[in-house]
């Protein structure tokens, strides 16, 4: 396993797909990183030289918020919405869909399992 930005990425995969194992980097961002670092997208991680890995790692560190920092930032954004009491914050607090989706027949995952009363002894 190669280590980029503190994350072990699989060596058998092509570089852009392997970079998506890092939280905050999708396939489009991974392609931009490969282009900026002049790394062939068809290369596998195992074929990269150490200086290529260092170049990719440095580019990510300088230009992107990833992993723990990104998770913390997202959590703080949600927390501020909840504290403001705005519509999106209320939806987060209640555990309902936030972006205007229908909830009458869908949103089972977001709403959770319905709790049916369990019949006791008579």
Curated annotation (Swiss-Prot):
A GO MF label: tRNA binding
Region Disordered, annotated ranges: 97-122
PROSITE patterns associated with the record: RIBOSOMAL_S13_1, RIBOSOMAL_S13_2
Cysteines joined through disulfide linkages: none
Keyword ATP-binding: no
Xref: Pfam families: Ribosomal_S13
Keywords linked to the UniProt accession: Ribonucleoprotein, Ribosomal protein, RNA-binding, rRNA-binding, tRNA-binding
Ribosomal protein recorded as keyword: yes
GO cellular component: cytosol; small ribosomal subunit
InterPro entries: Rbsml_uS13_C (IPR027437), Ribosomal_uS13 (IPR001892), Ribosomal_uS13-like_H2TH (IPR010979), Ribosomal_uS13_bac-type (IPR019980), Ribosomal_uS13_CS (IPR018269)
Superkingdom, natural source: Bacteria
An example Gene Ontology biological process: translation
Subunit structure: Part of the 30S ribosomal subunit. Forms a loose heterodimer with protein S19. Forms two bridges to the 50S subunit in the 70S ribosome.
Protein's job: Located at the top of the head of the 30S subunit, it contacts several helices of the 16S rRNA. In the 70S ribosome it contacts the 23S rRNA (bridge B1a) and protein L5 of the 50S subunit (bridge B1b), connecting the 2 subunits; these bridges are implicated in subunit movement. Contacts the tRNAs in the A and P-sites.
Family from the record: Belongs to the universal ribosomal protein uS13 family.
Protein name, as recorded: Small ribosomal subunit protein uS13
Gene: rpsM
